[in-house]
Every structure is written in C-alpha cells, then in structure tokens.
C-alpha cells in the first residue's frame, strides 16, 4: 500500500465515521479532509459525484470511490500498489 489515500468526510456523517474507524483500526494510513472546512475539497467531491457532496469519498491516486465499503478501499489500495 504505497499509494496516498485521502478520505473526504463531514461531521455527523455515520458512514464517514464508520469508515474512518475501520481504517484506523486496521492501521491503514490516510489523510482525512473535512469538506465543511475546506472549500476546495468540497468542490473536488462535488466534481466526482455529479454535484453532490457525497461522503465518504475516497481518493487513491487518480481514482475516486464514492461511499465505499472498507473492503472496496482495501481492494483499491491493493490494486494500486
């Protein structure tokens, strides 16, 4: 897992909280970006989700995953290395 991963999230989103917790528990390194505090990040999320601020959105290299499961993230990380 050498590819940098960014997790776009927002407060009070249970899906974001669950994915963040699973990633931390598994010790998967990632950068977490709160889209309510970072307008550029919010614009990125909208651009890959048809104008919606759908979170969690995960970026691995040039690939984006919208509301992925933990398994989907692990598979994407494995295939990117």
Predicted regions: what they are:
Residues 14, 37, 65:
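Glycine-/small-residue-rich active-site loops that bind phosphorylated ligands and cofactors
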Residues 17, 21, 43, 75:
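Alpha-helical elements of the RecA-like P-loop NTPase motor core of helicases
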Residues 29-42, 52:
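Thiol-based oxidoreductase modules, predominantly thioredoxin-like and allied folds used
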């Amino acid at each position: 897992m050498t590819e940098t991963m960014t997790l776009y999230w927002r407060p009070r989103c249970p899906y974001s909280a669950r994915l963040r917790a699973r990633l931390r528990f598994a010790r998967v390194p990632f950068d977490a970006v709160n889209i309510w505090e970072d307008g550029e990040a919010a614009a990125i999320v909208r651009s890959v989700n048809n104008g919606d601020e759908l979170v969690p959105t995960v970026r691995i290299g040039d690939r984006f995953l919208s509301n992925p499961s933990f398994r989907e993230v692990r598979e994407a990380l494995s295939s990117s290395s």
